[in-house]
């Protein structure tokens, strides 16, 4: 069984995080448009398709079946996450389903269980930051303090409501995605998820649970808080863009 841990770093916002534990039988691959060097990761330099670094990374994040046709199982980790335990211990979570991730409702600092609530939190934070720091807002970017365009998010949530997508229907925390991506149902759901991100909000946590619901796609939640658990550690906020000498 071929297995791969992978990440994607675009626009120079992260250095690749070296694992503190290397599980047996896994390849490690990092996609990037940046001059990164690692003795641990296989660095694959690729060209970005979008001006938005976040959306470029999300494309690799959501579609492992396109990048790893010879691997059966993949484990995505965000660029600011670290592998620190034997992730072979997690394979039972994708024994009877094709997808496992962490439950946002198990996050100690900010438990949530609803995409509509997540949307409200994102927009409220942007409103608050814009009000508190108006002098930082560029003339040509009124949504500078928002994680994404609030009008786009609201439009997307209204569409979900019009399709009768239920509230309190779960919310993933997408720092880690464990998938049996060679399976057709998983591939179709990931393609639909990517369509939501490509044409809607780049905030992927807003659209996964909807995409799973739409496809009747079953998945498991991994145990624990995504930011600090036996197998993974969140290393803090993404670094500011830096220029290599």
What role is predicted for each listed range?
Residues 5, 28, 65, 80, ...:
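A residue-level signal for conserved active-site and pocket-lining positions in enzyme catalytic cores
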Residues 6, 29-31, 44, 75-77, ...:
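Hydrophobic/aromatic beta-strand patches that form the interior of the parallel beta-sheet core
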Residues 1-58, 67-71, 199-203, 214-217, ...:
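N-terminal anchoring/stem segment of glycosyltransferases
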Residues 125, 130-244:
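Catalytic core and acceptor-binding pocket of nucleotide-sugar-dependent glycosyltransferases
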Residues 42, 46, 77, 101, ...:
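Cell wall/extracellular polymer interaction/catalysis modules
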Residues 55-63, 89, 154-161:
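Short acidic (Asp/Glu) patches
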Residues 62-116, 122:
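GT-A fold catalytic core of metal-dependent nucleotide-sugar glycosyltransferases
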Residues 1, 24, 61, 77, ...:
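Residues that flank catalytic or metal-binding motifs in active/ligand-binding sites
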